[in-house]
């Protein structure tokens, strides 16, 4: 199985886990509790702009949960807002007040519903440490995944705001 955590749009060959039910969601649930999935049953997990929506002290357990459900040599494709880039964008003197507000919403979440909040800012060093602590190996930084049309390839104001990593079990 290929599991898209936080997805909304159906794609052939993929199952969707989302905290909010909609017509394309196969599993309603939370990245923090993957108990509905058996150990080593998933080939690939894709999670774009999901990890920042949980509290930092719960992130390691969430990553360990993903590790548990992945098959041997399974892959985690993970994308998070890159705090280093977002901070650089926010202090850019060429951005106007409206653009800076947009960047700030990328840092703190859009806050359009009860789930659209960011609890933690990730950069490569932090995420790499958490992935290693969850026992992932071969952590590779990539420009994009070319799997879904989502925020992982978003470049507002010329800033590539996503940190995209592939981690192997």
Regions found by a protein language model. Give the residues of each.
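S-adenosyl-L-methionine-dependent methyltransferase catalytic module, highlighting the catalytic core
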Residues: 58-61, 65, 71, 75-168
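Conserved SAM-binding loop
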Residues: 2-86, 165-169
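Short linear motifs at secondary-structure transitions and domain/linker junctions
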Residues: 1-8, 20-23, 95-98, 139-145
């Amino acid at each position: 199985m290929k599991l898209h955590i936080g997805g909304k749009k159906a794609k052939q060959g993929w199952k969707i886990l989302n905290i909010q039910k909609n017509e394309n969601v196969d599993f309603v649930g939370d990245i923090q509790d993957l108990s509905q999935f058996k150990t080593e049953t998933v080939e690939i997990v894709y999670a774009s702009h999901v990890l920042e929506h949980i509290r930092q002290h719960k992130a390691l357990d969430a990553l360990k949960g993903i590790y548990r459900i992945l098959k041997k040599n399974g892959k985690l494709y993970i994308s998070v807002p890159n705090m280093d880039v977002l901070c650089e964008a926010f202090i850019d003197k060429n951005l106007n007040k409206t653009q800076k507000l947009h960047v700030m919403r990328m840092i703190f979440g859009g806050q359009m519903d009860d789930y659209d909040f960011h609890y933690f800012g990730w950069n490569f060093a932090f995420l790499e440490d958490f992935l290693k602590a969850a026992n992932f190996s071969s952590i590779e930084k990539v420009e994009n995944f070319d799997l879904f049309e989502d925020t992982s390839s978003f470049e507002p104001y010329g800033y590539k705001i996503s940190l995209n990593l592939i981690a192997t079990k």
